[in-house]
């Protein structure tokens, strides 16, 4: 009898434990499902927010800003891509409506991408048959077309910059006052700010000394290039050189250091961010701007295999450019593309 009671008690305890375990598992599962659902909803909301942000960024907009009691900003964006040159222009036009200033105000931010178009080529007709074409210079040019009533008053960047990263902030205050500083951030409590930020490791930015009130030009030029454990100047014929018996005319890439070691601006390309501040007399209704993005290429020529033949360097031997003309309607604060063309074998040459 005692043994029967023990069996019944043990059986009851086992059932209770099983029921408790099942309930706990179900509760944990429900809690996990709830957590997963919350997480999914959070992710979905975050993605929707990101989509809204992207959509809002892409739209032309008029927004109030801290530039005076009745000041406002109208933003426009124009994008032009050219497949032949692999160059993209993305321009932001910020119209500043300042009732305390007697002129129209416009900030133009020049963005986009100039792909490197890095190429290894084989030219069997030459002794130095293995060629490397790489982007030694990038150029951005902005000019006002035949209109003296529209003037360029400021630009970013200025002078020469050799740091790996370029950061600057332009600030506009009511009454036509403007200022610019290095770094990112507002320069005063009552202003509209616009920043530029881009990478140029192993390159230098140089603002042309010939810039004036209707024309500005920036050059981004290779300097000392670091790849793997090597550091060589752009003017060195042995730049990216590799003397190896496995290189053949059929495999020109083997005559040079691995491209995965090259600096980003050589391997991938350049993403410019340049800023121009303009004023326009209110009697003038429309102005055209011509914007040119150019890629200059140096050619390095090596002879395949083990040898003592010198390498050959040809600077600015090739180049491609994209030229776009934009028209600004000052009264309606709109922008449109009125002309576009591109060409090869057109490296930029100052003069």
Curated annotation (Swiss-Prot):
Residues 1-27 form the signal peptide. Gene3D superfamilies: Leukocidin/porin MspA (2.70.240.10). The keyword Methyltransferase does not apply. InterPro entries: Bi-component_toxin_staph, Leukocidin/Hemolysin_toxin, Leukocidin/porin_MspA_sf. GO terms for biological process: cytolysis in another organism. One of its GO terms (cellular component) is extracellular region. It comes from the Bacteria. The keyword Isomerase does not apply. Residues 30-60 have a biased composition (Basic and acidic residues). Residues 29-71 are annotated as: Disordered. Keywords: Signal. Belongs to the aerolysin family. This is Uncharacterized leukocidin-like protein 2.
């Amino acid at each position: 009898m005692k043994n029967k009671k023990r069996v019944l008690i043990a059986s009851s305890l086992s059932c209770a434990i099983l029921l408790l375990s099942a309930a706990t598992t179900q509760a944990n599962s429900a809690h996990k499902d709830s957590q997963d659902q919350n997480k999914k909803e959070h992710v979905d909301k975050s993605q929707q927010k990101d989509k809204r942000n992207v959509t809002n960024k892409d739209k032309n907009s008029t927004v109030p800003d801290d530039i005076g009691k009745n000041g406002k900003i109208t933003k426009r964006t124009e994008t032009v891509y050219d497949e032949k040159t692999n160059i993209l222009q993305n321009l932001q036009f910020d119209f500043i409506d300042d009732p305390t200033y007697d002129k129209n105000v416009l900030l133009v931010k020049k963005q986009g991408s100039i792909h490197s178009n890095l190429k290894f080529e084989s030219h069997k007709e030459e002794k130095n048959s293995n060629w490397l074409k790489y982007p030694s210079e990038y150029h951005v040019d902005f000019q006002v077309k035949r209109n003296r009533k529209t003037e360029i008053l400021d630009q970013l960047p200025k002078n020469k910059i050799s740091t790996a990263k370029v950061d600057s902030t332009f600030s506009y205050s009511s009454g036509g006052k403007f200022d610019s500083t290095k770094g990112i951030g507002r320069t005063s409590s009552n202003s509209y700010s616009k920043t530029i930020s881009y990478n140029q490791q192993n390159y230098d930015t140089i603002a042309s000394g010939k810039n004036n009130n209707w024309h500005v030009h920036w050059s981004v030029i290779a300097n000392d290039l670091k790849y793997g454990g090597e550091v060589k100047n752009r003017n060195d014929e042995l730049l990216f050189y590799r003397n190896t018996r496995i290189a053949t005319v059929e495999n020109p890439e083997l005559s040079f250091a691995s491209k995965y070691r090259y600096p980003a601006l050589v391997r991938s390309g350049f993403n410019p961010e340049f800023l121009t501040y303009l004023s326009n007399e209110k009697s003038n209704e429309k102005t055209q701007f011509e914007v040119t993005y150019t890629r200059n290429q140096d050619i390095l020529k090596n002879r395949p295999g083990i040898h003592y033949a010198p390498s050959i360097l040809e600077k600015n031997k090739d180049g491609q450019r994209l030229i776009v003309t934009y028209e600004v309607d000052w009264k309606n604060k709109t922008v449109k593309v009125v002309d576009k063309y591109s060409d090869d074998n057109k490296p930029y040459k100052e003069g």
